[in-house]
Structures are given as structure tokens and as C-alpha cells.
């Protein structure tokens, strides 16, 4: 992995590239041969477990784009920065990428907390972020393309499925103590109660905390039909191990999580989380031709033991969606790329075709997967059609921070 601030160059300049003056009128880092973009994730700290795959996926996409001739005939160069699992650091590094490196776009962030810190920088510097993580919704910015699912595509869809298919009536909500889990659980609670079901407990642990004994004890005492867990980063390892140590077996106790993908399972260990359900657009096990090619390319670049989760897949989408928007706009200028983005379709996405909505989120399918001991998921449900994104669903708008 590259160190912060370094740039990686991959040859692939196509002939006949349009003149730089015609495709760059705003002073971003574009020459006749290259254009620079930023990658901004946590390579260190508690979030490195979750964000490492995003870095790898973005680098793979950029390499593939360069090998196919680049963007508007220019190869993509990367300026990488480490957010270090610290939200103000994310803001500072985003400012550097935009003000000093003058990148045309940033691919990055993972937590809602880091995204919220970066948003004012994007607005001040007129930047564009491709954000890969499923999140709570309740936000829409012209400076962000959200490649992950929002609440209606994940939280509500997952709850509706477990109520319908498992007959769930009572829920215990648990999460890491920051914006995304708290906002997501507020949405979940309202939806659960609107459906005539009950929340029998709600608890949080600090991000990075490894002491879950008291929370696990309260879960056992409450005896919920469903544990609804949004524990994030390295805390996942401790949480699931302590559930098992307390005798909570996920082949008997229903657990639905929005925060565990194949990436996190690699750190947790399949024996501790097998049986859990998660709602996502992507699973590595999807039997689609585009996904088989994606998995093969990812493993060829990063090793045969590499795994790919939903957010890693969403990160891979970012550079491709940016390329399509740049080529539609005929320009690297951020305002033109933003204007060109709605309606962009990515027919070759590993999870299946998707497109950008006017609200900067994605039309996409939703799937339910059940964790296996080998670190993969069995897909037990998927929607037939693409689900329209709605970051401000009826009855939830007032929850927006």
C-alpha cells in the first residue's frame, strides 16, 4: 500500500486526447497526459479493518481504467491520504487534496462522522466526493455521489424482511456511539414501532471499545427476537466473540447487522458470526459474470486470500462512475461532472446494473445474505427490480441532523 501523499502512475494514455484547455477550466491537476484524483481512507486506526478494502478497490478500478486508455485520453494519477480513523484529520487531508494536490475528485471516507467533517471542505473548495458506505440517509449534497445504500434500501428493507420472513416482533438495538449507528437506530426504532413491534433495549459502546460484557448481559436478559447490530470497525471482533462466549449462538438467535461485510468477517472469524443476516447490494458470492470477473481481478491484484464486501464493491464503483460522468461532460471541471452525473448507468457493475439518481444516490437492488463459517454469505433474498433511493423517506425527515 502506498504511503500518504504519494502518487501512483499507471501507463495507458490514449491517442487523440482533447486539449487540456478544453477539459479543465477550473485549475484542477490536469495535463495533456494525466489527471490527478485523491483517495482518502483510514489506513491506520480502528477503521483500517473496514476501510482497507475500499483503498484496494479504488486502486483496482483506476488501474483498469488506465489500462483501457484512461479518461479523456489521460491516465489517472493517485494522491493518497490517511484519515487515520480521526474525523478532523479527514477534513484536513481533504483540504490538502483539494487545495494543494488540486485533485479532480476524491474517493473516500467510510463513517458518517468522517463524511460530515469533510462536507464543509468540499463546499468551500468546490470538490466532489464519491462516498462508498451504506449509511443512514437524511442527507443530500451536490458535492457527493453516494454509492452505498441509504435507509430505505438497507435499514427499512432489512427490517421488513426479518419481520415478514422470520415473524420477528421484538428487537434489541446495539451500535457504536457515533452518527451513523445512532441515526440508523432512530430510523429503525420508528419503523419497528410503526409496524406494531417492540424495541426491548438499545445500547451503545464507544467506537473502538472492546468491552461488551454488560451490553451482552442486557441483550440476554431482554430475550429479543432480533439483535439489530451496527457495531463498527475493530469493535466488531470483540462484540461477536463476547456474544458467543455468553452462549448466544447465531444459528438460533436472529441477528441482523448493517455493519458487517466479508471484509469485517475476515477479522471477526466465521465461527463467531456464522448465521447472522445482513442487508446489502453486493456479496462476493454473487453468481454474475461481471462479479466473477471483478473477484478474479481483485484477487489477482491483492492476493488469493483477499475478500470483497459491500463497501469495497461500492468503492470500486466510484472511479468508474466518475469516468462515465467526465466523458459524458467532456470535461474534468467539477461543476460539469456534477451536472452530467444524474442518469449515468453502469451496466457492468459487479452487483448488476445500476444508475445515478438526481438525488446523487443509486438505483440498486437490495439483497439479504446469511453469514457462513468460511467468511462468505449465502444470498437468501433479493429484490427483482432496482429500488429507487429516497434519502428523506416520509416520516423521517425531522431526524436529519
Indicate where each model-derived feature is located:
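Solvent-exposed, acidic/polar segments of extracytosolic/periplasmic ligand-binding ectodomains
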Residues: 13-18, 35, 345-401
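Immediate post-signal peptide segment of exported/extracytoplasmic ligand-binding proteins
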Residues: 16-39, 70-75, 163-169
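Extracellular/periplasmic periplasmic-binding protein-like sensory domains
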Residues: 243-316, 327-332, 383-400
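Extracytoplasmic ligand/sensor domains, especially the bilobed periplasmic-binding protein
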Residues: 103-203, 253-277
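Signal peptide-proximal N-terminal region
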Residues: 30-32, 37, 56-78, 194-196
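N-terminal export signals
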Residues: 1-20
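Beta-alpha junction/loop-to-helix N-cap segments that form part of ligand/metal-binding clefts
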Residues: 23-25, 49-56, 69-138, 205-212, ...
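Extracytoplasmic "Venus flytrap"
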Residues: 22-57, 81-88, 110, 175-182, ...
Amino acid at each position: 500500500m502506498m504511503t500518504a501523499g504519494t502518487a501512483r502512475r499507471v501507463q495507458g494514455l490514449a491517442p487523440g486526447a482533447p486539449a487540456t484547455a478544453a477539459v479543465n477550466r477550473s485549475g484542477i491537476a490536469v495535463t495533456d497526459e494525466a489527471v490527478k484524483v485523491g483517495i482518502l481512507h483510514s489506513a491506520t486506526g480502528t477503521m483500517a479493518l473496514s476501510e482497507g478494502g475500499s483503498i484496494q478497490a479504488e486502486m483496482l478500478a483506476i488501474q483498469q481504467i488506465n489500462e483501457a486508455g484512461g479518461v479523456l485520453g489521460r491516465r489517472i494519477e493517485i494522491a493518497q491520504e490517511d484519515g487515520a480513523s480521526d474525523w478532523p484529520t479527514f477534513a484536513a487531508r481533504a483540504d490538502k487534496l483539494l487545495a494543494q494536490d488540486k485533485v479532480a475528485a476524491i474517493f473516500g471516507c467510510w463513517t458518517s462522522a468522517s463524511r460530515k467533517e469533510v462536507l464543509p471542505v468540499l463546499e468551500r473548495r468546490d470538490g466532489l466526493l464519491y462516498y462508498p458506505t451504506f449509511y443512514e440517509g437524511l442527507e443530500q449534497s451536490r458535492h457527493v455521489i453516494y454509492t452505498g445504500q441509504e435507509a430505505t434500501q438497507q435499514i427499512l428493507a432489512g427490517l421488513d424482511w426479518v419481520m415478514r420472513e422470520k415473524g420477528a416482533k421484538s428487537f434489541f438495538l446495539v451500535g457504536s456511539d457515533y452518527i451513523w449507528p445512532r441515526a440508523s437506530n432512530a430510523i429503525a426504532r420508528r419503523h419497528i414501532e410503526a409496524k406494531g413491534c417492540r424495541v426491548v433495549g438499545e445500547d451503545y459502546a464507544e467506537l473502538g471499545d472492546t468491552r461488551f460484557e454488560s451490553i451482552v448481559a442486557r441483550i440476554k436478559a431482554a430475550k429479543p427476537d432480533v439483535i439489530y447490530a451496527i457495531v463498527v470497525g475493530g469493535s466488531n471482533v470483540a462484540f461477536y466473540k463476547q456474544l458467543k462466549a455468553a452462549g448466544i449462538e447465531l444459528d438460533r438467535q436472529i441477528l441482523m447487522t448493517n455493519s458487517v461485510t466479508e471484509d469485517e468477517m475476515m477479522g471477526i472469524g466465521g465461527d463467531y458470526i456464522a448465521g447472522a443476516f445482513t442487508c446489502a447490494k453486493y456479496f462476493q458470492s454473487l453468481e454474475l459474470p461481471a462479479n466473477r470477473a471483478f473477484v478474479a481481478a481483485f484477487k489477482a491484484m491483492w492476493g488469493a486470500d483477499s475478500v470483497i464486501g459491500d463497501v469495497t464493491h461500492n468503492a470500486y464503483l466510484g472511479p468508474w462512475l466518475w469516468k462515465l460522468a467526465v466523458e459524458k461532460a467532456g470535461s474534468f471541471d467539477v461543476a460539469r461532472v456534477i451536472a452530467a452525473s444524474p442518469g449515468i448507468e453502469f451496466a457492468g457493475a459487479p452487483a448488476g446494473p445500476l444508475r445515478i439518481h438526481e438525488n446523487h444516490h443509486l438505483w440498486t437492488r437490495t439483497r439479504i445474505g446469511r453469514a457462513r463459517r468460511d467468511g462468505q454469505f449465502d444470498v437468501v433474498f433479493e429484490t427483482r427490480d432496482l429500488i429507487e433511493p429516497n434519502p428523506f423517506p416520509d416520516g423521517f425527515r425531522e431526524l436529519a441532523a
